[in-house]
Structures are given as structure tokens and as C-alpha cells.
Amino acid sequence: MEMKPKYDPREVEKGRYEEWVSNGYFKPSEDKSKEAYTIVIPPPNVTGKLHLGHAWDTTLQDIITRMKRMQGYDTLYLPGMDHAGIATQAKVEAKLNEQGISRHDLGREKFLQQAWDWKEEYATFIRQQWAKLGLGLDYSRERFTLDDGLSKAVRKVFVDLYNKGIIYRGERIINWDPKARTALSDIEVIHEDVQGAFYHFKYPYADGNGYIEIATTRPETMLGDTAIVVNPNDERYKDVIGKTVILPIVGRELPILADEYVDIEFGSGAMKVTPAHDPNDFEIGQRHQLENIIVMDEYGKMNDKADKYKGMDRFDCRNQLVKDLKEQDLVIKIEEHTHSVGHSERSGAIVEPYLSTQWFVKMKPLAQRALDNQNTKDRIDFFPGRFENTFNRWMEEIRDWTISRQLWWGHQIPAWYHKDTGEVFVGEEAPEDIENWIQDEDVLDTWFSSALWPFSTLGWPDTNADDFKRYYPTNALVTGYDIIFFWVARMIFQGLEFTDRRPFNDVLLHGLVRAEDGRKMSKSLGNGVDPMDVIDEYGADSLRYFLATGSSPGHDLRYSTEKVESVWNFINKIWNAARFSLMNIGEDFKVEDIDLSGNLSLADQWILTRLNETISTVTELSDKYEFGEVGRALYNFIWDEFCDWYIEMSKIPMNGEDESQKQTTRSVLSYVLDKIMKMLHPFMPFVTETIWQSLPHHGETIVKANWPTVDQALIFNESKQTMEQLVEIIKSVRQSRVEVNTPLSKAIPILIQTKDEKIKHTLMDNISYLHKFCNPSQLTIDTEIEIPEKAMTTVVVAGKVVLPLEGLIDMDKEIARLEKELDKLQSELDRVDKKLSNENFVNKAPEKIINEEKEKQQHYQEKYNGVKSRIEQLKA
């Protein structure tokens, strides 16, 4: 197959993915003699199109599974999507609201049909994006969290945990979204610093002797106060414990109680307790058997318990209440105060801690098992390892999980209430006399079904399902470090509880994709990047390679168009090297013609040695998920060694008369390029398939080609050492030419003084490389040479490289030129130094600008030192 003259990603990628899918290349072989390898995709939400974070996440998964497929594993990369309860419902409701329709106008059944329509529309977009990224997914196994099979798994888990007493229904403080009117999980609450106030109020003692000072940021909740607590070790309040105060406005008598929760140093050291509107207060209330008084309704408006404030919005109530307290001279002071306030991720509403009857999971027994498992041979390995400590800490500090949501889109809770007796029935199927029962209207938290993802997607609860037996446990989970607790931990404890095995062997955690300046990408900042736009401009291979190699595990990634463009340049370099090679290999050269047993040149032996070292490095680093290091190893070998050196060196035999030497060079070019394509394939699937199809090869597709392995017979360490010496000499000559302003096209005398006879003979044996790359008018190589008085000498491993300067340059003129350049560099250094010593600039300028100036400073300093050194050398 002929390669086009220019690399065009659109041309290269067009139709290729459809070809892979239609030929079934991504389906597991199901060959029982092979070891199975499985990754299930972290299911994207069907709320919208995929962002750069998804592209990063799935690219890493695809790299791993493509590599494992090539290494001979029976590989399954399973696709799927998440119904994303509150997020999708909010999107569908917003769409309906544009038409002036609410979900209640439609009713549950019709609303759910709208949600399913939304799901189908966005699932199509997501599949199109997966295709553009080139993900090797087996679509015949695609799953959705509301599929029948997964719904069955959800019901079984709920019922089993309920029967074990781990799931229960009760009153607890939950995150309440008054706009969406539903409970929220902790991950659906975004904490933002808000400018508010600390209100200091007087709570008069019931006996009329003074008051106790209470501070709060939420005055509206004081209407639900049921006690005051102080620390029993606080000397200020020892005499008032057991007394009572009068709750302002309401007039209710509140006891003063002792509780060690209170921080003596914070505020006045006395704290109001509102058990129905604060999680910590609720715990205190439980310890002291306090009444729970709810003062708001589900809309965030004050209810009957709020007396004259009934019907007011909670924040309007706050303002009015403070005004009324001022009139009663009960306000001591109001301080400005910045504090963290929870907002609903979906609706943006300020979240209200709210006492509500919900369904909960007791987390302690499940978390303990997950912790204990980390001390067994079945432990899960975290990459980077530091995240295991994060996981353990969260498991140790875990609280019960609110799993019910006041939504329609999701898994409806499999609990029914008897119409007459109120009896609760929990079962995988509805009661037989269904006419006497009403099903709980709430649905389960999205994370409840997501927690079952690694095994529910493979056929569980049918433990005899072929896929479950073959592909579970999965091998690796790749996801962001921000959801270790919300998703990773839950999959671990549910996997252990219901399958008695870890759900995955490894957890590879990456960070967040940030803008170039380090800020988080967001719609409000307008700095988001659509991965599909990047692919349209630079191709999927460029984006994939950048995402995979741009950071190390566990770290954030700064998106940079410049860096994506540099990957495009790298691919273009590979394309041109492949075209050159193919032109020299010739159309008639077949894979059977590859013969490395002939007379290999020094360059051949060197590149084959470096190829084997690179194969070893890439394989080893990939097993540790160190793809940033893999990227560097591949780039250095391909760009610096294969393209810049070997391709150029191969021109010597290819332009010569020795046919057998030409044939050997063709073999080496073909062999090395084949291995390069295979190593690059997981990162750059499209361009490598195109180039590989043009090379002499066996097999239908590179997707199923064998991963390269080290061939000890093709490692020539002595030749590698010799080539390193030659390359150092050539680089030294070229650098010296630059320093004395002499182009490579001008032939000049070159002297090489070697350390010993062996090196001398080695260099003499390979003198053709020195002639080609140094362009000497006269080349002297010896252990003893007379170094001219005026000469430029560089020390290298092999000895010394000397360039006589007599007649080469006008010394005085060159020194004058360099001194002028030195003055310019000094001016630039002074300017940068002045800028960086300016406190105003350093404190106010963006980090990116400061770093740019520091880089300039380093660059100018290095150039200054180099020019100064050249002047001194010339003067000497």
C-alpha cells in the first residue's frame, strides 16, 4: 500500500475505525488457552457529550487493552453508560421547562419516556466520540445502568443488604437540594467559599440573670434549637450547666448541657444545637435525647414550626429574624465571615442540611471488610501507591450512606408499604397482592448501581454466566482520583460483599485536566476544550499521545495546544521516516525477505540494540502504568536515534554499490519500523495501522499483531558503545562549527586524538560515518597528535576533538562579534532580573507569566555563559 506524500490525520483516520469494528477485531478471542484480561469502561453519564477528562480516561484504558491484546491476552474492553439520576433528570426537566411543561404535568410514565429518549440521543453522541478516539470496545457487550440485567442485580443487592440489616430506613441529616427537591450524595455537593456573616446573639438565662453568647452563620435555623452545649472542661460555664435559657423570638426554654464536642477555643465556647438542621448537632441530639424540630419544608421555605416566619424563603427569614432580634437588643455583633457553603452540583441551589426519613446503608461493616482485604494476598494495588492511604483513611472515617433520592429517573426502590397496616415489604419482585401495596416512589442514588458495575456488566447475579466466570474479576480500573471514595471504594466493598473477590486487581488514578494556566476547565471560565475539536484539527493520534504521556499517574494534566501540535510534528516525522524507508525498501520487498543474519553494519547493530533496549523499557514501564516515561522513551528512540541518526546513516549503504549491504539495510529498516509501529500502536492506533499496512507484514491488522519482545541475538553492546562515541564526536564537531560560525557545507581539517589504540582502530574502521557527518577536508585520527596553537578543543569520551582555527576565521573579527552578542545578552539578563526582583510583579502576575520569565532568565544565562566561554577560548 502506497503512503501519501503528506501526513493528513483526516485521511488516515477516515473509515479505519468502522473497518476494525466490522471485522470484530475488538471482540475477545474467547480462547480458553489464553489468559483473560478485562477492563470495564467507567460509564460516562448520558447527560451530554464527553469532555477532555473522559478522553484522557478512556485513552489510558484503550492503551492498556490494545497492548494486552497484542501480548496474547484474551482481552475484553467493555463499554457502557450511566443513567446519572439527578444529572439527567435535571437536563430533561430543563428541556421541558423551555416548553413551559413540568415533570408533574407529564406524570411519571411519560416523563420517563422523555428521559429514555434523551438517553438514546446522547448515547449516540457518546458512541460517535468513542469511535473518533479509536477505542477498542466490544459493542456487543455494551451495558447501561438501567438495563434489565443490571436492574436485577441492583434489586438483589438491595434486598440482600436489607435482609442482613445493612440497609435500613430511618431519620438522618442529609444534603437536601430545595430546588430539585431531593436528597444528594456528598459528591453532588460542591463546596464554595462564600462571603457571609457570623451573627452573635444573646440567649437570656431563664432566671433573668444575664445571657449566654451564641454565634451562628445560619440564624434561620435557631428557630429549631433544642439545647445549648458547652464543654464540661470549660471553667467559664461550669456553674451554668443544668440551667436553662430562653430561645429568642420563640420563647422556648433550652437546657444547657455538657458535651466534649464543643471547642473551648472557638467563638464564645457555647454552641446552639439544632438537631434537625446540622449533622453534628444531630449526633449531639442523639446523645442527649433532644427533640428534632424541622423548621423548613422541602422547598427551603419556613414551615409551621417557624411561627410568624412561616412561608418565608429561608434567606428572607434570616434577614427578618436578625432585624427582629436587633429590635429586641439581642444582637451583640455581626462580623463579616468567609465560609464554605455547599451548593448542588446540578441545580446550583445552596444545600440545606435537613433531617429526613431516607434509606441508608450501614457503612462500617462493609468498609471494615474492604480495609481487612488490603492485608490479604487479594489486596488491590493502587497506582500511585499513596492513594491507598487516602482510601484507608476514608474507609476508617466513613459514615452511613444515604441511598434514596426523590427523583423519577433511576432504579425505583424495591420496597412496598401496605395500604392498611403500613407494613414494609422488601423484595426483588412486587408482592403478589400488589393491589394492597404502594411502592416507595424514591429511586436509588446513581452510585448504588455504579458500585456494582464491574460484576453486574458481566452477568452477575448469574454466577454461572460465561462472561462472569471468564472475565471477572477485572484487571484494572482507570479513573480520576477525585472519585476514589464515591465510586472506587463502593465498587470494592460491594465486590467483596457479593462476589467474595476484589472487583479489580489494580486501580490506576489520574488527575484532572486543567487549562494551560493551571485553572480548572469550566463553562463559566470559558476555558473548556472539546476533544472532538482537537481531533478535527490534529487527529486522534496526536490527542491520545499527548493525553497519555503528558503527566505521571496521580497528577493533573495541563492541556496545551502547543504540545498537541508538537505531537502532530512527531507523527509527521514518523510518517516521513516511514516514506523514506518504504521508498528504499522497494515494493517488491516482502516480509520473507527480511534477513538479519548478513553483514550488519555498525549502525545496523547499534539501532537493533537500541530497539531491543526500548522494547524492554517500554514494556516494563507500561506494566507500571508509567506512560509519561514510556512516551519519553519512544520519542527519544524514534526521533533522536532512528529518524535523526539511523535514517541518515542508512543512506551510506543505500547510495553505495554493495547490493548485499543494501539488502541488509532494507531488512533492518523494515524490521525496526515494524517494531516501532507495534510499540506506538496502543498510543497512535490510526497512523500505525496505515504505516504498518504499507510495510512488509504478516496478518490482517496491527490490532492483532504480536507485541515486540526482546531478541538477545540482536543486542550488540560493543557496537552500541562505539556508535555512542562516534555520535559524541560528530555532535562535538557540529557544535564547534556553530561556535566559530562555520557551516557544515564548508570542508575543514579535523583532528581526533584518541585515548588508546583500540579506540583509534575502531574509529578508523568506521571512518565513513565521520566523513559523511563532519565534512572534513582532512581527517587525522591518532593517539598522539600535535594540537595547533590556535585551535578549538573539545574533550569527549574517546579522547579530544580538535578544530584548527588558523585560516578558518578572522580571530579579532570573531571576538568582536561575540563581544557584541555578549552585551546584548547582558541587557536581556538585566531586564529579566529587574522584572523578577520586582515584588509587585511577582505577587500579581499569573504563575504562567512568572515561569516564562524564569525560563527566559535561564536561557539567557546559559547563552551568556556559552558566548563568554567562546571568547575566552578564542583569546587563549
From Swiss-Prot:
Keyword Flavoprotein: no
CDD domains: Anticodon_Ia_Val (cd07962), ValRS_core (cd00817)
Main location: cytoplasm
Ranges spanned by the short sequence motif 'KMSKS' region, renumbered to the chain: 520-524
Membrane spanning residue stretches: none
GO biological process per UniProt: valyl-tRNA aminoacylation
Residues engaged in binding ATP: K523
The enzyme's E.C. designation: 6.1.1.9
Motif ('HIGH' region) on chain: 44-54
GO molecular function: aminoacyl-tRNA deacylase activity; ATP binding; valine-tRNA ligase activity
Gene3D superfamilies (alphabetical): HUPs, Isoleucyl-tRNA Synthetase, Domain 1, Valyl-tRNA synthetase, C-terminal domain, Valyl/Leucyl/Isoleucyl-tRNA synthetase, editing domain
Subcellular location: Cytoplasm
Reactions it catalyzes: tRNA(Val) + L-valine + ATP = L-valyl-tRNA(Val) + AMP + diphosphate
Coiled-coil region: 805-876
Keyword Lipid metabolism appears in the UniProt entry: no
Family per similarity comment: Belongs to the class-I aminoacyl-tRNA synthetase family. ValS type 1 subfamily.
Domain notes per entry: ValRS has two distinct active sites: one for aminoacylation and one for editing. The misactivated threonine is translocated from the active site to the editing site. The C-terminal coiled-coil domain is crucial for aminoacylation activity.
Function: Catalyzes the attachment of valine to tRNA(Val). As ValRS can inadvertently accommodate and process structurally similar amino acids such as threonine, to avoid such errors, it has a 'posttransfer' editing activity that hydrolyzes mischarged Thr-tRNA(Val) in a tRNA-dependent manner.
Complexes and interactors: Monomer.
The name this protein goes by in its record: Valine--tRNA ligase
Organism: Staphylococcus epidermidis (strain ATCC 35984 / DSM 28319 / BCRC 17069 / CCUG 31568 / BM 3577 / RP62A)
